[in-house]
């Protein structure tokens, strides 16, 4: 019996961490945390030819970025081959598994006959009860003695009761290859059992593996965990999510300026809901998440929803957290004077962290050039003269409200309107016709810097 609720995430390090994988990890993490249990990380790196140290590092980095803390040390399957061999031997000694000496040519011949007869390709069990002399020159595989009739039945936490007919889904499948390396289904069962995994939340692409794993659990005398098979994430066109739908690598989202809080909030809702609520902090989710309420049907990736959530978190997260995330992207906000004011200036309109970075640079650094389209659209002889007069009379405003009052008084005296002056000021100060509130930009820069930038712009325009 499992002493403590324990979940795991077990990726193969053959590529980057896909957002579907991150959702699986998140579901396992939340369920463990809700129940005061353990959340384990296991790297399934038995495929020594395809494994990548960079991929392993990227998976761990993605966890760190998202704030998903696993319990204990990371388990690497590549360090457990001796353990797997012990359990292969155990099954052989107990007569629950056997050596199969079928050659590659014999296997191909069998499959050709089955295809010709329009039968499902399957191993015919010829070495299941073999007691003769093994053929020479053949390195055998090890096969499990699987049920040949009846049903494999289990209660899935998402899909309900699932039934597989033994004859439809399995033959005596291989648990150890001819070179002695164990197969995927075998290592998963050994590790989940020995690591005390009580609940397995994973994609429903693993559903067909489950009956084979149950056969192994029973053969080894291990307790079968509770399974939850989650439907895949689809693109907005209804097809399985892929790169053509946008970014799929978790760390690409970081580089795009997406906050981890937004990404996790977005992913948890792709398959799970709590009433009509849309926004959940990680702490909220640790209390609310229940895998028994995961939707049975596939979820649809909605880029606009992710953008909306990212905008929300940019507006609402504490200054120190935004500053930390910006620094992680190579932008140190703290080097600027009035950094908190600058962030508040920019975060209201920002959809990504790059909007803050680009906005900060455009305000803090005097423009080296000016958006020519904006100049053509908003600047003319009349408002250049108005801009010159504005700079000449600008003396003592300090706050945004001061600048607003000063500007309104100035425009009233000149019998002009704000639309005649606002865009030329924006262009002069930032090089662009797009910026936060012009009065707050004026406050941030201060009178001297504003006058300096306006004078420089007028000089460039020949004034």
Curated annotation (Swiss-Prot):
EC number: 6.1.1.17
GO biological process: glutamyl-tRNA aminoacylation
Keywords for the protein's UniProt record, in alphabetical order: Aminoacyl-tRNA synthetase, ATP-binding, Cytoplasm, Ligase, Nucleotide-binding, Protein biosynthesis
Motif ('HIGH' region): 11-21
Membrane-spanning ranges: none
Annotated SUPFAM superfamilies: An anticodon-binding domain of class I aminoacyl-tRNA synthetases, Nucleotidylyl transferase
Cellular localisation: Cytoplasm
CDD domains documented for this protein: GluRS_core (cd00808)
GO cellular component, one term: cytosol
Superkingdom per UniProt: Bacteria
Cited function: Catalyzes the attachment of glutamate to tRNA(Glu) in a two-step reaction: glutamate is first activated by ATP to form Glu-AMP and then transferred to the acceptor end of tRNA(Glu).
Protein name, per record: Glutamate--tRNA ligase 1
Species per Swiss-Prot/TrEMBL record: Campylobacter jejuni subsp. doylei (strain ATCC BAA-1458 / RM4099 / 269.97)
Biological classification of the source: Bacteria, Pseudomonadati, Campylobacterota, Epsilonproteobacteria, Campylobacterales
């Amino acid at each position: 019996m499992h002493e403590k609720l324990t979940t795991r995430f077990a990726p193969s390090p053959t590529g980057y961490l896909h957002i579907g994988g991150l959702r699986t990890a998140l579901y396992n993490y939340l369920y463990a945390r809700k129940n005061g249990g353990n959340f384990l990380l296991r790297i399934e790196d038995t495929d020594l030819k395809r494994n990548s140290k960079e991929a392993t590092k990227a998976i761990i980095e993605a966890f760190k970025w998202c704030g998903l803390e696993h319990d204990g040390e990371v388990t690497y399957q590549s360090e457990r081959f001796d353990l797997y061999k012990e359990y292969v031997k155990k099954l052989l000694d107990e007569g629950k598994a056997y050596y199969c000496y079928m050659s590659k040519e014999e296997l191909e011949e069998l499959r050709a006959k089955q295809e010709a007869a329009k039968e499902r390709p399957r191993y015919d069990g010829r070495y299941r009860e073999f007691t003769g002399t093994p053929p020479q020159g053949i390195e055998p595989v090890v096969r499990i003695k699987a049920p040949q009739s009846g049903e494999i039945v289990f209660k899935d936490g998402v899909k309900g009761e699932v039934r597989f007919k033994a004859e439809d889904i399995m033959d005596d499948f291989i648990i150890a290859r001819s070179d002695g390396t164990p197969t995927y289904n075998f290592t998963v069962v050994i590790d989940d059992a020995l690591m005390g995994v009580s609940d397995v939340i994973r994609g429903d692409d693993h559903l067909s593996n489950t009956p084979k794993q149950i056969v192994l659990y029973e053969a080894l005398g291990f307790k079968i965990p509770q399974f939850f098979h989650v439907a895949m994430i689809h693109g907005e066109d209804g097809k399985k999510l892929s790169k053509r739908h946008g970014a799929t690598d978790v760390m690409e989202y970081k580089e795009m300026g997406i906050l981890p809080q937004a990404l996790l909030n977005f992913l948890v809702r792709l398959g799970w809901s709590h009433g009509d609520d849309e926004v959940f902090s990680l702490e909220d989710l640790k209390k609310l998440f229940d895998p028994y309420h995961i939707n049975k049907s596939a979820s649809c990736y909605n880029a606009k929803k992710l953008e909306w959530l990212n905008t929300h978190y940019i507006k609402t997260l504490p200054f120190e957290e935004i500053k930390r995330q910006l620094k992680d992207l190579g932008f140190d906000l703290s080097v600027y004077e009035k950094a908190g004011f600058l962030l508040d200036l920019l975060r209201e309109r920002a959809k990504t962290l790059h909007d803050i970075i680009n906005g900060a640079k455009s305000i803090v650094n005097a423009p080296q050039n000016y958006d020519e389209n904006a100049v053509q659209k908003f600047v003319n002889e009349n408002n250049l003269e108005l801009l010159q007069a504005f700079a000449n009379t600008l003396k003592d405003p300090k706050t945004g409200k001061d600048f607003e009052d000063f500007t309104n008084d100035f425009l009233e005296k000149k019998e002009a309107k704000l639309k005649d002056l606002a865009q030329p000021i924006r262009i002069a100060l930032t090089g662009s016709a797009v910026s936060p509130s012009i009065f707050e930009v004026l406050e941030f820069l201060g009178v001297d810097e504003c006058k300096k930038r306006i004078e420089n712009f007028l000089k460039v325009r020949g004034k």
